[in-house]
Amino acid sequence: IKSVVRPSFTSDFRLALGFARSRSVIVGIIAITVIVDMWATPIRSIIPVIGEDDLGLSPLLVGVLVSSQGVGSLIGAALIAFRGDPAKYGRIYFYGSFLYLIPALLFSLSNWFVLSLPLVFIGGLGLAAFSTTQGALILMATPPEMRSRMLGLLAVGIGIGPIGILNIGLMATLFGPSRAVMIVSIEGIVALAFAAVVWPMLRRGEDISPS
């Protein structure tokens, strides 16, 4: 029986990085994932604090506020699953990221529950658009023999999330929770605008297949 020699982790990782660099669209997908997980998704951890401290909500209404994002995400994911066109996943992914951050910025400026609630709900729709298409885009842009490696790189990008939580926690300590959400939202929007220039194929909805 012949033994199978498996490549080392470092050589496998270098191979994955080399392939990703050769495909600009993959770099763009992972870059937007890093942006969202650094500056967007950590905002969820501050919503209850804003609800209680800045909006003066009861525990029940704080729960309603936080859960509205989950409702938005559920509806958004269902719409994409049953009505989404894979040819438009690039646009859904890109603009969904904005659809999370822009309502988050407006939420940081709101003093009323009746305004904050739909903003958090809309953010949930954006989060669903982002999260349900990122893995699919990697698969669509990668040949079968490289898909597992590219999904691994995507997971590395997602792993930046805890750093984002530490960042927004520091901002909240220094400037208060609402101001922290405003700061990180603006940072994320600026970063996404930069990504729109560097990787325009996603916002344009271009064909990203490896052929």
PLM regions and their residue ranges:
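Juxtamembrane intracellular "pre-TM" segments in multi-pass secondary transporters
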Residues: 1-31
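C-terminal transmembrane bundle of multi-pass solute transporters/carriers
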Residues: 12-14, 21, 35, 47-211
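Short helix-kink/termination motifs in transmembrane helices of multi-pass secondary transporters
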Residues: 29-30, 38-50
